């Protein structure tokens, strides 16, 4: 009598694996967003809403995150609600430097959340070579045409999220994540005794 065990593939992981978050912290992220839900009459800033959306999106938990403006730096965690209110966005939108930094850290797939145009479109496009970008625009209309071109050039995705509805940003973050990885099932078949 032969005993056998069918080996099943590992369940598909919904982790982002080699994908990182690239969050715009330039000066324009300090702009307030009109909201009907403001409890104390204080309007939230774009940066506050961005940090909240990332904190509240379970699929983003555990992902490596980078903040960028003139510089780009990896962060250990998304600022808490209290810490976010103390955060002061400054500088410009140096996408070239941001792409170079995340690639140097080994990330070639990134979810870019931004409200503006880069300092240099040509340099940003060149620095994005070899990357795949999920781009989420959170600024005011009109949408910068360059961001759509950048998504196409990197075989990525493009979405717009209205910051007056944070749920739109949370949904856009989830949709920009790479699909679960297709891992090879273990080799083998039956075990005979």
Set out the residue ranges of the language-model regions.
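Negatively charged sequence features
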Residues: 1-14
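…and closely analogous acidic/polar surface helices at protein-protein or active-site interfaces
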Residues: 16-19, 27-65, 87
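Short coil/turn segments at beta-strand junctions that form active-site/ligand-binding loops
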Residues: 17, 61-62, 106-108, 131
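Residue-level marker for buried hydrophobic side chains located in beta-strands
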Residues: 19-21, 112
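Residues that scaffold, gate, or flank divalent-cation-dependent active/transport sites
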Residues: 24
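Von Willebrand factor
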Residues: 51, 64-121, 138-148
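VWA/integrin I-like adhesion module and closely mimicked acidic/polar interface patches used
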Residues: 86-89, 116-164, 170-174
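C-terminal "exit" segments of structured domains
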Residues: 164-193
């Amino acid at each position: 009598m032969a005993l056998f065990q069918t080996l099943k593939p590992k369940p598909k992981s919904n982790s982002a694996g080699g994908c990182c978050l690239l969050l715009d912290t330039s000066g324009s992220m300090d702009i307030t967003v009109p909201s009907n839900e403001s409890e104390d009459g204080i309007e939230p800033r774009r940066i506050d809403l961005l940090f909240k959306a990332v904190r509240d999106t379970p699929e983003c938990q555990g992902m490596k995150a980078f903040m960028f403006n003139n510089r780009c730096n990896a962060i250990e965690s998304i600022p808490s609600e209290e810490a976010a209110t103390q955060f002061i966005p400054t500088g410009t939108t140096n996408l070239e430097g941001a792409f170079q930094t995340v690639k140097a850290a080994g990330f070639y797939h990134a979810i870019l959340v931004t409200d503006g145009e880069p300092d240099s479109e040509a340099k940003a496009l060149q620095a994005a070579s070899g990357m795949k970008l999920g781009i989420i625009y959170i600024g005011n209309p009109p949408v910068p045409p360059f961001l759509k071109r950048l998504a196409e050039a990197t075989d990525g995705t493009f979405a717009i999220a209205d910051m007056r509805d944070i749920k739109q940003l949370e949904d856009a973050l989830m949709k920009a994540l790479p699909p679960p990885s297709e891992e090879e099932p273990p080799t083998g078949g039956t075990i005979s005794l």
